[in-house]
């Protein structure tokens, strides 16, 4: 078959798109890997429609194919003739902060539902799409191209975190986010109980006419869109919630790689966690550097973003398949895919601290190394891009057949 895959200027998205392209070619398919950023709308549509392909693959919501047209109310994917595969590595609308925009895009996705396929990390996204009449929606997990084996030697680093965070939920300006005071409470609930599901509370919130009125005139026109608008707002609290959790670690050194969203340019107590046991290191420059830190850390912390209730994010797969040890907030999907999920998960800040103390103690090395090896063995054959592509192709084949019969 013939595919177009769109590249991305965002490193994590481009890494995923590149891995999909490489793996499809290994399967023997023809892949056009394109940078669409230089096209205007007309040239983009005409160029893509002029190429004979079976599927256009979009791996993130910022791809050009998912832009709204400059000339009318349609989205560019509506103007393409090819079938489209959307791979949603984030919550469906987490990048957008306009109810009307989300509603329009959801309708546009409904318009092409007979020739499109959605693969979602988050289970609630599948429910959302089906509620909108989009039936070709399937669960998918992340994959990783890392293949480093665990090392059974003393770690270079102790407790580490790679990624962005802020210092505190208390310092974050909740009033700057529509519905922000409600959303901040949800962030605190997730801080207190990592398996707390935000989606039911979001759904309840949009039943309140007073809340809807406070969100503006578009809020009561499409409740599905309003829910996603609130989830996008809630996700802004992810970085401060991570810092809030890490601030509870008092008895172990924590090294944060990156972390500061301003990269040191802004002096603001919200941006940097001021704590004697917390040390900031330069941001990693590439994913091989990250892989090395994952492998050489005693404990890699993972704290999922608030846009997800159940999904396992890519950091967990990357840590394990870099030969590292991960300690993560409790994720329902992790219990579905990992036999040892309970051993590497925490529900509360107190449990996180207890497990940091336990796995940091060299007296527990046998248990620590056994877990690291066993989880790596479980993941290495299951969460590859070969398996991800195989899953996608097997899912779209019967859906294609069913659509031909309609």
Q: What residue ranges belong to the model's regions?
A:
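Short N-terminal targeting/anchoring amphipathic segment
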Residues: 48-65
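Active-site proximal beta-strand in glycosyltransferases
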Residues: 77-92, 119-120, 158-160
């Amino acid at each position: 078959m013939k595919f177009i895959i769109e590249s991305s200027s965002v490193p994590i998205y481009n890494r995923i798109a590149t891995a999909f392209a490489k793996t499809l070619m290994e399967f023997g398919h023809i892949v056009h890997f394109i940078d669409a950023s230089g096209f205007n709308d007309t040239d983009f549509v005409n160029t893509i429609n002029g190429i004979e392909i079976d599927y256009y693959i979009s791996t993130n919501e910022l791809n050009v194919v998912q832009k709204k047209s400059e000339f009318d109310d349609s989205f560019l994917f509506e103007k393409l003739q090819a079938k489209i595969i959307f791979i949603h590595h984030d919550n469906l609308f987490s990048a957008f902060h306009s109810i009307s925009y989300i509603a329009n895009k959801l309708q546009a996705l409904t318009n092409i539902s007979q020739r499109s396929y959605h693969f979602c990390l988050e289970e609630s996204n599948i429910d959302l799409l089906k509620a909108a009449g989009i039936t070709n929606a399937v669960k998918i997990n992340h994959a990783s191209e890392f293949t480093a084996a665990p090392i059974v030697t003393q770690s270079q680093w102790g407790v580490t975190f790679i990624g962005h965070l802020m210092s505190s939920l208390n310092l974050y300006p909740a009033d700057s986010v529509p519905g922000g005071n409600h959303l901040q409470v949800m962030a605190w609930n997730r801080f207190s109980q990592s398996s707390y599901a935000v989606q039911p509370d979001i759904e309840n919130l949009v039943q309140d006419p007073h809340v809807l009125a406070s969100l503006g005139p578009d809020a009561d026109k499409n409740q599905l869109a309003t829910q996603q608008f609130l989830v996008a707002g809630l996700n802004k609290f992810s970085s401060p919630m991570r810092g809030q959790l890490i601030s509870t670690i008092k008895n172990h050194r924590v090294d944060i790689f990156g972390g500061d969203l301003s990269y040191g340019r802004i002096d603001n107590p919200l941006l940097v966690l001021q704590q004697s046991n917390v040390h900031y290191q330069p941001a990693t420059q590439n994913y091989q550097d990250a892989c090395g830190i994952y492998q050489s850390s005693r404990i890699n912390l993972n704290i999922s973003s608030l846009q997800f209730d159940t999904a396992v994010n890519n950091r967990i797969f990357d840590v394990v398949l870099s030969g590292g040890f991960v300690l993560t907030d409790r994720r329902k999907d992790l219990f579905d895919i990992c036999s040892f999920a309970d051993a590497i998960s925490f529900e509360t800040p107190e449990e996180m601290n207890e497990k940091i103390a336990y796995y940091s103690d060299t007296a527990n090395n046998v248990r620590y190394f056994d877990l690291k090896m066993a989880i790596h063995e479980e993941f290495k054959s299951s969460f590859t891009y070969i398996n991800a592509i195989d899953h996608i192709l097997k899912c779209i084949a019967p859906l294609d057949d069913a659509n031909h019969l309609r």
